Amino acid sequence: YLMLCSITNGKGQPMKNEERLDMMGKELQDTLAHCLRRGDSYTRYSKSQYLLLLVGTNRENCSLIFERIQKYFSREHKTWSKYLEYAVSSWRTRINSEDNENKWKWGKTWDK
């Protein structure tokens, strides 16, 4: 699966506070380095987003992986958890898809 982790303003919009975005971006990078499993990979997609390749997992476990990321990310700043969002897509579905239908499944942590 591919997961896109995004730092937002807490309301689903892009973070405009550059200083805060830089601080959160560094923390998210440290979090990913600590939380991902052996075999998983990540790269910085933009200043506010990281793309993760999650190997050998299923869609249900993607939410558990995100919860682990979110918990570690907000361990020192409890309110930071609301600034993270994620989307997941099966890379096999994306490669084999013959249509242009949007296959991303959005997960917002406040919808639980």
Task: Give residue spans per PLM region.
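Conserved long alpha-helical elements within nucleotide-processing catalytic cores of c-di-GMP signaling
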Residues: 1-4, 8-33, 43-47, 59-67, ...
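A short glycine-enriched loop-to-beta-strand structural element that forms part of the catalytic core
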Residues: 1-3, 40-55, 78-111
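Short catalytic/binding micro-motifs of nucleotide second-messenger systems
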Residues: 34-39, 71-81
